[in-house]
Amino acid sequence: MSNVISVGMADLKTTKAPNILMTAGLGSCIGICVHDPIQKVGGMAHIMLPTAGSAPGGNPAKYADTAMDLLVTEILRLGASKSRLRAKMAGGAQMFSFPGKPPVLKIGDRNAEQVIVELKRLGIPLLVSDVGGSFGRTIHFDVGTGDLKVRTINHGEKVI
């Protein structure tokens, strides 16, 4: 019997199969899911911003550049092999329109780009993503199968 484990904003959790990780309220935030398909362990981070920048020492789960290292460390503690880790992500929407404003305000795009940078640095392949648009998402990640269910209002539900 699987348990659904909720991951809050600026939070990360790891678990073993048959558990499912869930986060809601992904607008410009990114839900990044990493798992080892052989050991059937994985984790999810709900990342709010691309880099810690001038806020070092804060909550590492809040930022892509610090959350990814922590997420991988915690997954490895559950018995995963770094060489088998795979990732999927969702979110990164542009929830509000800022015509004529600088790219710095496109937080969703910047979050997705930074997660990709961190995955490349860590040598973890990104298998699939569902990012962008102007709508929020709720995701459920099955760490046993690696299935990521993405649910949206007015845009349906899909498994990636």
UniProtKB/Swiss-Prot annotation:
Q: Keywords in UniProt for this one?
A: Chemotaxis, Hydrolase
Q: Which GO terms describe its molecular function?
A: protein-glutamine glutaminase activity
Quickly give the catalysed reaction.
L-glutaminyl-[protein] + H2O = L-glutamyl-[protein] + NH4(+)
Q: Which one GO biological process term can you cite for this protein?
A: chemotaxis
Enzyme category, top tier? hydrolase
Query: Which domain of life does the protein's organism represent?
Result: Bacteria
Assigned EC number: 3.5.1.44
Q: Per the record's keyword annotation, is Hydrolase included, yes or no?
A: yes
Summary of the function given for this chain in its UniProt record: Probably deamidates glutamine residues to glutamate on methyl-accepting chemotaxis receptors (MCPs), playing an important role in chemotaxis.
Family, per the entry? Belongs to the CheD family.
Q: Which HAMAP family match?
A: CheD (MF_01440)
Listed name of the protein: Probable chemoreceptor glutamine deamidase CheD
Q: What is the lineage of its organism?
A: Bacteria, Bacillati, Bacillota, Clostridia, Eubacteriales
